[in-house]
Amino acid sequence: GILSLVKGVAKLAGKGLAKEGGKFGLELIACKIAKQC
């Protein structure tokens, strides 16, 4: 369901954030979640 999808995305995002780092990554995720890019 939706929750497992979100968890999967969060895992991928976490790996991406570990590489890219910090605020920009979080803003990008928030933007994608809110669909207000």
From Swiss-Prot:
Keywords: Amphibian defense peptide, Antibiotic, Antimicrobial, Cytolysis, Disulfide bond, Hemolysis, Secreted
Top-level lineage group: Eukaryota
Disulfide bond entries: C31-C37
Compartment(s) of residence: Secreted
Gene Ontology BP terms: defense response to bacterium; killing of cells of another organism
Pfam families xrefs: Antimicrobial_2
Entry GO CC: extracellular region
Tissue and organ distribution: Expressed by the skin glands.
TM helices/strands, residue ranges: none
Family per similarity comment: Belongs to the frog skin active peptide (FSAP) family. Esculentin subfamily.
Physiological role: Shows antibacterial activity against representative Gram-negative and Gram-positive bacterial species, and hemolytic activity.
Protein name: Esculentin-2A
Organism (species): Pelophylax lessonae
